[in-house]
Amino acid sequence: VFEAFSLVTNREPISRSVLEAYGFDTSKVVDLACPAFMFEPASTQDIAPFIQGTPIENKEKPTIGFVLCGWNMIQGPFNREDWKDEEFVQYVELIIHIVREFDVNICLMSHSNGFILPPNFKPIKGRDYPIVEQLYRILQKTEIADSVYLMDGLYNPKITKGIIANFDMLISGR
């Protein structure tokens, strides 16, 4: 079936490598940027319930969004569930440095959702959420705990982009 397509678009270079490793002809595969930049953000009014009580709403200090996923970790596979706290050291050090140096708040956020398959279809937090949640737990044991917030909701793409639009800066590995 794969060979019958005249064009296959690909977002992650590793996907091409995986296809090639399994013997697929990738001559019709074209690597492209993630199309998320084309999504329209939700309005400030629409995101209000999702940012209530967060540093984004309070605006006491600049707020930096921080998105982390398995692809950003030093050792894969990206979909592991057994991350050790030691594997987050460089991110912890980076966030501590940013908070100290620039007197900002950090909002940790997952960038993707998952779902339970039909017939019981239900959106759920994606595989990236436990990663940012673990980073949050680690940071809660540091002197900057009060400057770190975990965005723990389940957000659709429009709401996600609306939230991101309200960060003063976004740091993302994706």
Each language-model region and where it sits:
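Active-site anion-handling motifs in enzyme catalytic cores
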Residues: 1-174
